[in-house]
């Protein structure tokens, strides 16, 4: 989104939006109502590097933030995957032990469904944040 230079006629009007229009021009003097000392592109040239630097900082910080979130969610996904494998092994051993003791087996259906839904949501978030991260890198 490039910065458009404000034409002289618009910059010399002191209406309700004067503070917005003169944000890059410095303080407005009351004795200077009709004309300003700036040419059309002076404001653009003076603020171009600052605008570019602020834009770079914004995109770079957003990219770092989404990359950190992506890494955390990827680690969470790996932990969930390993946790499910350990929990399934525990469930199998517990079920065999309860069968050998002649007791009723425990129903783990709700726990398993919640774990699968949690992994699914984490996987979707990893994919979406990876896409956001690549969008910020491309900018």
Swiss-Prot record:
Induction: Up-regulated upon HHV-1 infection. The keyword Oxidoreductase does not apply. It comes from the Eukaryota. The chain crosses the membrane at residues 56-76, 116-136. It is found in: Membrane; Nucleus; Cytoplasm. One of its GO terms (cellular component) is cytoplasm. Keywords: Cell cycle, Cytoplasm, Host-virus interaction, Membrane, Nucleus, Transmembrane, Transmembrane helix. The keyword Nucleus applies. GO terms for biological process: positive regulation of cell population proliferation; positive regulation of viral process. InterPro entries: TM250. It is a multi-pass membrane protein. (Microbial infection) Interacts with herpes simplex virus 1/HHV-1 protein CVC2/UL25. May play a role in cell proliferation by promoting progression into S phase. This is Transmembrane protein 250. It comes from Homo sapiens. The lineage of its organism: Eukaryota, Metazoa, Chordata, Craniata, Vertebrata.
